């Protein structure tokens, strides 16, 4: 569009791109690098206009920013500063102005960036206001039921007087706080820099302080307020500091900032107290998706993501479309007031002026069931909790549609099923969509939301996957806690809240399918004449990746993770290892729990059956099925032993291992019974141990690693494995070493995608340098470490590798003479647990989980371990006194323990790099893998 008499410069300036809406072009520009944007701005007048838009430079800047950010007056200047572009002569660079161009999209965005919200407050009284409400009243009328505005809760807080923008800036100006914004990067700003930004910015969706670590960054702030008496029950509080999900936030933001439409994580409830400024709130009940919002639920892991306009854009562009009956519940929050948001409620907040607030999320007996439901495997129930019946599959949705409206009213496309993702959208679209259709359809679709939907735990649980398996279904990265932490949480609640066991059991059945696993446990106990399971023993312990139950004198583990085939190889290898250990004269025997029984539990023809199994044959329940087993496996003493397990892993390297026994996985479970160790696992004692206890632990682990690594292992018998790297056969390289190196080589093929999936805190800059750090020659050099060895008394290149010596697999017992009133002051290590992840490989591999998980990077403890380990880390006669006879420098590098260990960390199938960059925070800005190697593993070179 142009004014009368002016030419339209768009066709000439954009060429073929002129057919695209401005919104689309602006989105595409965000994918370019800053320097490319600068070049593109020189192409034409319209490109100059589009490439100088501040929202574009804001997006570019936030995608590249790392660590503390300092705003330089505009986002373009800030981005150029980050890019290292000097702007000394910027004063003479005046902006160009062009006629013949108009964009409604850019104008609306400009309006949103500069509009004032002085008269934007709203309160029609549809959120109740209460003062001096009792806990009993709150529980009966509001808790997990409906929002309420509460006054008087913060009257006695020091924060009511001291949490102003100026006072906070004066006291905490140098403290960096985390910033909320739409890029995945974690960005912080010193408070003084943030306030400077806040006062000068003209952003549509301004950055705002949203810091869940403010109590650690500025501990004095925690003394300025207290949790109101209505919200002091928080069941997540029993988790230790590292496992507890984020639960409290300091919120500081300017006019126009605020949280767009969302449902709080894990369906928790929340309270939010405003200390200064004014906030406009809008809320919808559970299942009622706001207009313009799209809910994505991934069918693979149930991960939920939400596409939503900014708060300001929603109120300006979408709110006017709503009929009165479809408008949200609204209020304006004033200083000193607290709003309570129940579980599952949609809410959106817009700051009408600079504000300071504090908020906390919590779990109590009223919303506990919903929290458990949200962490249950599957995806249907997650969609229904947030989007109501609109989240159902197409065929179910159509049935419900017919009950609520005629076919010709099909104006609101709310269901779009793709292969990987179910999307539920209340349309409103972009700047160019037809809003008339939306106006006609919204009310009718909201009527459909009401029909039959209930935010009731029993109703919502009916949408759970009937075949759900907590131990095998993918775990959503969006869940508030990890799988083990969630099981540990339920286990702790079971012990600490016996009066709530009926509710906790219901939640455990929803999240874990606990009733199913309890039935399996009872069948195993009955077969082996073990005591009946008591009320205290009904839930599996939180640690481990399989259901493990601790009875009075027994520990029972059901193998389910990864499906039946993986479970059979896990138990089969463990039983083979115990057989070898039993015939060896090794002191390791006394530090591994005694095996009392093992077998297979299966459900057949309506009843459970149990058969013993010692690992030395293929059980009938499997051999009688339609599975083909080759002669080598049938003739193996342990058909599911280490080398058959290794062959399976070798065949499936780089892709998820299929479960060949999949048809049996849902009703066949291997198990093992061991004698229960007295005491506690190290994970439960970590914070209570003395330094002397920790040194004793390091001494113990050094001894037991030595014992494990000296234990003989079976020779490679599988012909397929013997042919691995046959091209190097003339070098007389031990077969097991060839197998190990080949597995590493396979892992490198998808290492970049694996690291990208893990994401933060792994620096993205280092991901591009993996090939430089681990060239393909690395694997050839690693093979050659053991060339021309003649057997004899040569130290073997490989050993048994436990693979999982972590804080939950080390058992501690109290010193018998060291207790006061039953409280023990000192603990000593007694046992190493769980040998189901055994492999054979480089002994250095066992140091990785110990140093990172058990020792948390404590170099003194690693030194203590190595002192008592006493075996060479470089097991080759080509290495003497830390040097090599080979002149090749790359071969020398491979022989370096620090380099080799760093390579193993990068290629590891578990996210050990995440642990490294969490322990050594300063390495997140590392520019090379060599820097990481020297910081973390250089100690090994002096051993």
Curated annotation (Swiss-Prot):
Cofactor note: Binds 1 Fe(2+) ion per subunit.
Cofactor(s) needed: Fe(2+)
Gene Ontology CC entries for this record: nucleus
Domain F-box stretches: 14-60
Residue ranges occupied by any JmjC domain in the UniProt entry: 216-379
UniProt superkingdom: Eukaryota
Binding site for Fe cation: 262, 264, 347
Subcellular location: Nucleus
Compositional bias (Acidic residues): 396-410
Keyword line: Iron, Metal-binding, Nucleus, Oxidoreductase
Signal peptide boundaries: none
Keyword set includes Metal-binding: yes
Record family assignment: Belongs to the JARID1 histone demethylase family.
Physiological role: May function as histone H3 lysine demethylase and be involved in regulation of gene expression.
Protein known as: Lysine-specific demethylase JMJ21
């Amino acid at each position: 569009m142009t004014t009368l008499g002016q030419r339209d410069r768009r066709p000439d300036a954009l060429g073929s791109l002129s057919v695209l809406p401005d919104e689309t072009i602006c989105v595409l520009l965000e994918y370019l690098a800053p320097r490319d944007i600068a070049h593109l701005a020189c192409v034409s007048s319209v490109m100059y206009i589009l490439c100088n838009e501040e929202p574009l430079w804001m997006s570019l800047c936030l995608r590249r920013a790392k660590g503390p950010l300092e705003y330089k007056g505009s986002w373009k200047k800030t981005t150029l500063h980050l890019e290292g572009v000097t702007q000394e002569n910027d004063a003479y660079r005046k902006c160009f102005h062009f006629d013949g161009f108009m964009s409604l999209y850019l104008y609306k965005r400009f309006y949103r960036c500069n509009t004032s919200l002085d008269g934007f407050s709203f309160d029609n009284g549809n959120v109740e206001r209460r003062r001096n409400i009792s806990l009993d009243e709150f529980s009966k009328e509001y808790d997990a039921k409906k929002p309420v505005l509460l006054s008087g809760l913060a009257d006695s807080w020091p924060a009511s007087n001291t949490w102003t923008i100026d006072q906070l800036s004066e006291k905490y100006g140098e403290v960096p706080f985390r910033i909320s914004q739409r890029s995945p990067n974690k960005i912080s700003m010193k408070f003084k820099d943030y306030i400077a930004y806040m006062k000068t910015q003209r952003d549509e969706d301004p950055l705002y302080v949203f810091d869940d670590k403010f109590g650690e960054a500025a501990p004095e702030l925690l003394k300025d307020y207290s949790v109101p008496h209505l919200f002091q029950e928080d069941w997540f509080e029993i988790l230790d500091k590292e496992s507890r999900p984020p639960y409290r936030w300091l919120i500081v933001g300017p006019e126009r900032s605020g949280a767009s439409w969302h449902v709080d994580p894990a369906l928790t409830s929340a309270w939010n107290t405003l200390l200064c400024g004014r906030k406009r709130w809008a809320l919808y009940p559970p299942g009622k998706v706001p207009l313009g919002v799209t809910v994505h639920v991934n069918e693979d892991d149930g991960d939920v993501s939400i596409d939503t306009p900014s708060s300001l854009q929603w109120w300006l562009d979408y709110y006017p479309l709503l009929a009165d009956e479809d408008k949200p519940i609204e209020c304006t929050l004033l200083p000193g007031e607290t709003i309570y948001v129940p579980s599952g409620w949609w809410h959106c907040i817009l700051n009408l002026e600079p504000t300071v607030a504090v908020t906390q999320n919590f779990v109590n007996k009223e919303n506990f069931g919903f929290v458990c439901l949200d962490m249950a495997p599957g995806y249907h129930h997650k969609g229904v909790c947030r989007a109501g019946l609109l989240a159902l599959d197409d065929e179910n949705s159509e049935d419900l549609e017919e009950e609520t409206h005629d076919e010709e009213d099909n104006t609101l496309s709310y269901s779009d099923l793709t292969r990987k993702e179910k999307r539920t959208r209340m349309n409103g679209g972009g700047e160019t969509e037809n809003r008339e259709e939306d106006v006609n359809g919204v009310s009718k679709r909201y009527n459909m939301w009401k029909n039959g939907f209930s935010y009731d735990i029993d109703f919502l649980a009916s949408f759970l996957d009937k075949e759900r398996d907590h131990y095998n279904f993918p775990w959503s990265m969006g869940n508030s806690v990890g799988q083990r932490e969630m099981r540990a949480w339920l286990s702790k609640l079971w012990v600490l809240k016996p009066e709530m066991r009926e509710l906790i059991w219901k939640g455990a059945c929803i999240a874990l399918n606990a009733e199913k696993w309890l039935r399996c446990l009872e069948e195993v106990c009955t077969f082996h004449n073990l005591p009946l399971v008591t009320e205290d023993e009904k839930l599996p312990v939180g640690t481990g990746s399989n259901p493990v139950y601790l009875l009075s004198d027994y520990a029972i583990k059901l193998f389910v993770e990864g499906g039946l085939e993986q479970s059979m190889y896990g138990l089969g290898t463990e039983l083979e290892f115990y057989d070898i250990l039993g015939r060896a004269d090794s002191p390791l025997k006394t530090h591994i729990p005694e095996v009392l029984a093992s077998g297979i539990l299966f459900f057949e023809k309506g009843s459970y059956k149990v058969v013993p199994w010692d690992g030395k044959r293929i059980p009938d329940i499997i051999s009688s099925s339609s599975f083909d087993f080759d002669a080598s496996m049938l003739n193996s003493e342990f058909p599911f032993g280490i080398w058959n397990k290794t062959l399976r892993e070798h065949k499936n390297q780089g892709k998820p291992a299929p479960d060949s026994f999949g048809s049996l996985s849902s009703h066949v479970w291997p198990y093992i019974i061991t004698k229960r160790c007295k005491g506690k696992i190290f994970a439960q004692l970590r914070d209570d141990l003395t330094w002397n206890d920790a040194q004793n632990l390091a001494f113990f682990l050094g001894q037991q690693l030595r014992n494990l690594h000296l234990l003989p292992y079976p020779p490679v018998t599988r012909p397929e494995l013997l042919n691995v790297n046959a091209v190097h056969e003339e070098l007389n390289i031990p077969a097991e070493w060839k197998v190990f190196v080949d597995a590493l080589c396979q892992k490198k093929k998808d290492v970049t995608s694996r690291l990208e999936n893990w994401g933060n805190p792994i620096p993205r800059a280092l991901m591009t340098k993996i090939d430089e750090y681990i060239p393909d020659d690395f694997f050839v050099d690693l093979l050659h470490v053991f060339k021309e060895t003649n057997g004899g008394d040569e130290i073997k290149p490989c050993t048994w590798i436990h693979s999982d010596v972590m804080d939950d697999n080390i058992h501690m017992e109290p010193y018998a003479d060291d207790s006061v009133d039953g409280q023990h002051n000192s603990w000593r290590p007694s046992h190493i647990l769980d040998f189901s992840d055994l492999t054979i490989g480089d002994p250095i591999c066992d140091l990785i989980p110990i140093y990172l998980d058990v020792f948390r990077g404590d170099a003194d403890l690693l030194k203590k371990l190595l002192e008592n380990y006493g075996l060479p880390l470089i097991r080759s006669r080509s290495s003497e006194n830390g040097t090599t006879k080979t002149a090749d420098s790359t071969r020398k590098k491979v022989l370096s323990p620090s380099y080799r260990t760093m390579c193993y960390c990068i290629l590891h199938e578990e996210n050990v790099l995440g642990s490294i960059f969490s322990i050594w925070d300063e390495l997140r800005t590392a520019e090379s893998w060599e820097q990481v190697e020297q910081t973390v593993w250089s100690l090994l070179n002096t051993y």
